[in-house]
């Protein structure tokens, strides 16, 4: 364990290496338990076969955490079920390749690619954590990731509002600044209030995660889901309203609002869709 930490963490933390997380598959998006990628023992190696899609950083990453099926067992009701494990895969491992880069609507500066495993052989000590507990590891990773995406959404919304406030002060129609019109003022006020509400949810989730990192036996799945759900929706709504206040200029690339609007949408999709966040929240309520 410590040898792996010494090998990977310094380079990842310094930025010399970039990492990526491989969970999503062509047939396993929201249904993350529907994994098809497999890892089979072969002497001192694991042999991986399958593919992953929509993997952030994949085009440039040096090391990947990959979730793959290692065991098939019967659950308490006698139904067949899959157990997944987590593995460390290096870019240079035989049988591993990075597929096509996605041509995305937004976050175009972020590399998003397919991962392909064709009899990819990795040393046995590259299993991460406990065998059969990869799904739990993935879900814990997503809890933290959702706070990060909520923060991203919050930043997009705040940036869009700042750009819009500056624009409406300068833009003149009917002989005066459009910031003088009540409609503009009410739009700005509502956007500001919604952003601040989202901010408190994001900070509350981050605080709960910090408590867990400091040793407290607390979970933050619901807080992370709430923060992501509201912050992502806020980002999409705020950028749409901001573009409307920009008018035709907002629809051009002379101003950043159109990019912010495109970037906002992905926050409602990755690290779990908004619908998944509602499943997490309602599941806790009805438990």
Language-model region placement:
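Alpha-helical interface subdomain recognition
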Residues: 4, 11, 15, 29-32, ...
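Short Gly/Pro-enriched turn/cap motifs at secondary-structure boundaries
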Residues: 27-30, 54-57, 77-79, 104-111
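Beta-sandwich/jelly-roll carbohydrate-recognition scaffolds of carbohydrate-active enzymes
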Residues: 36-38
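Short beta-strand-to-turn element immediately C-terminal to the catalytic PLP-Schiff-base lysine
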Residues: 40, 66-70, 88-91, 116-118, ...
